[in-house]
Amino acid sequence: MVEPKYKRVILKLSGEALGGEKGFGIDWEVVESIAEEISKVRELGVEVAIVVGGGNFFRGRSAEHIDRATADYMGMLATVINSLALQSILEKRGIPTRVQSAIEMRQIAEPYIRRRAIRHLEKGRVVIFACGTGNPFFSTDTAAALRAAEIDAEAILLAKKVDGVYDSDPKKNPNAKKYDFITYLDVINQRLEVMDSTATSMCMDNQIPIVVFELAKGNIIKAVMGENIGTLVNVKEER
C-alpha cells in the first residue's frame, strides 16, 4: 500500500467553498462530501486539523459601515457557525471531532490550547480551529499558517474554487498560465492570490509546503498522497 506523503496536515477551507455554488450559507452536500473525504484520509493514518473561513456568512474586509476590527470579529463568529456545522457532520459519520476556538466560548467549543490540540490529533481526532487567530486584521489564511507551525503540520492543503495558482485570473484571462510549482517568494513578489502575504511569509519562514487545489471529489486524498494535483508552493520543487 502506498504511504501518504503527509502524516499531519492542516486543511484550509474557505467559507465560500462551504457555501457551494451560491457561496452563501451552508451547502450540506458540500459539507457531506468533505466529511467523506476526511474519513478516507483518516483511514490512511493521516492526522487532520481544519481551519475554516467565514466568508459564506460575513467578510470583515468588505464591511464598509463599521470599523475593521469589529467587522473582523464578526467574521470570526461566522467561522464558529461553519466549524460547528462541520463538526456535526463529521461526528454523524463516527469521526471524533473537537472544535477549538481562539476566542473563548466554553459552552460550544474548547479554548485553543496547543498541547491539547496535538494530543487530540495523536488520538485520531479531527481538530477544527475556529475564530482565526482571535485577533482582528489577521485572515484565516494566516491562522492556518500559524496553527500549522504550532502543531508541526507537514503541509497546508488549501482547498479553493480554482484548480491551482495562475499568473492571472483564469476567469478573466483565457490564456492564464497555471503553475504546477511556484516558490513562496514568487507568490509574494507577483502578488498572486494564493494566501495573503502575511500567511505566505509565515509558511516560508517555517518551511511549510502549501498545496493549492480545487475542492472537488477525491482531491483532498490526492493532495495528502502527494499526487501531482493543483499547485505546490514551497522553497524548491520536490514532486
UniProtKB/Swiss-Prot annotation:
EC code: 2.7.4.22
Swiss-Prot/TrEMBL GO biological process terms: 'de novo' CTP biosynthetic process; UDP biosynthetic process
Transmembrane intervals: none
Stretches for region Involved in allosteric activation by GTP: 20-25
Catalytic activity: UMP + ATP = UDP + ADP
Notes on how activity is controlled: Allosterically activated by GTP. Inhibited by UTP.
GO molecular function: ATP binding; UMP kinase activity
Pathway entry: Pyrimidine metabolism; CTP biosynthesis via de novo pathway; UDP from UMP (UMPK route): step 1/1
Keywords, sorted A to Z: Allosteric enzyme, ATP-binding, Cytoplasm, Kinase, Nucleotide-binding, Pyrimidine biosynthesis, Transferase
Positions that bind ATP: 12-15, 55, 59, 166, 169
Cell compartments where the protein resides: Cytoplasm
Enzyme class, broadest EC rank: transferase
Residues annotated to bind UMP: 54, 72, 133-140
InterPro entries the UniProt entry points to: AceGlu_kinase-like_sf, Asp/Glu/Uridylate_kinase, Uridylate_kinase, Uridylate_kinase_bac
SUPFAM superfamilies registered for this protein in UniProt: Carbamate kinase-like (SSF53633)
CC annotations in GO: cytoplasm
NCBIfam families cross-referenced by the UniProt entry: pyrH_bact
Record text on subunit structure and interactions: Homohexamer.
Purpose of the protein: Catalyzes the reversible phosphorylation of UMP to UDP.
Stated family: Belongs to the UMP kinase family.
HAMAP family associated with the record: PyrH_B (MF_01220_B)
Protein's UniProt name: Uridylate kinase
Native organism: Caldicellulosiruptor saccharolyticus (strain ATCC 43494 / DSM 8903 / Tp8T 6331)
